[in-house]
């Protein structure tokens, strides 16, 4: 719900329709940001003004959203969750069996802006990497790049856990492709 309103602010540029107690009126972007519900309107999320621009970019324009056919032998699926906050992340990789390189990657995440941004950023990191290199990615790299605050580090940990789970699933389908 709030995400659509954030998009409205960005798309409309200089004005936004605002339905207040006295009817609908057009207000400027600065006022729209002050009056329209932001990401921070949800108790599970920090206010948008506290997010780093890279988080907002990956949240509003997530890369590689979608699913791959989990039944394909060269697709690994990692499904992880954080019971503390309710975030759930599914990350899928499609691997070239001959080279061991991740050629395609998709994700679906139910969670806060930081979880979505961490998922999106992880997909960019792993595409084109070997399984061995992808398995070496640490949550600290994601957290540093996205400037996640300490309270959101679990989101980057989910992304690390998801890629490791996807690699493990791929390897379980193809037992001869274990990491060294």
Swiss-Prot record:
Component of the core Fe-S cluster (ISC) assembly machinery. One of its GO terms (cellular component) is mitochondrial matrix. Belongs to the NifU family. It comes from Kluyveromyces lactis (strain ATCC 8585 / CBS 2359 / DSM 70799 / NBRC 1267 / NRRL Y-1140 / WM37) (Yeast). The keyword Transit peptide applies. One of its GO terms (molecular function) is iron ion binding. Binds 1 [2Fe-2S] cluster per subunit. It is found in: Mitochondrion matrix. Scaffold protein for the de novo synthesis of iron-sulfur (Fe-S) clusters within mitochondria, which is required for maturation of both mitochondrial and cytoplasmic [2Fe-2S] and [4Fe-4S] proteins. First, a [2Fe-2S] cluster is transiently assembled on the scaffold protein ISU1. In a second step, the cluster is released from ISU1, transferred to a glutaredoxin, followed by the formation of mitochondrial [2Fe-2S] proteins, the synthesis of [4Fe-4S] clusters and their target-specific insertion into the recipient apoproteins. InterPro entries: ISCU, NIF_FeS_clus_asmbl_NifU_N. GO terms for biological process: iron-sulfur cluster assembly. Pathway: Cofactor biosynthesis; iron-sulfur cluster biosynthesis. Keywords: 2Fe-2S, Iron, Iron-sulfur, Metal-binding, Mitochondrion, Transit peptide. This is Iron sulfur cluster assembly protein 1, mitochondrial. Its cofactor is [2Fe-2S] cluster. Coiled coil: none annotated. It holds the Pfam family NifU_N. The keyword Calcium does not apply. It comes from the Eukaryota.
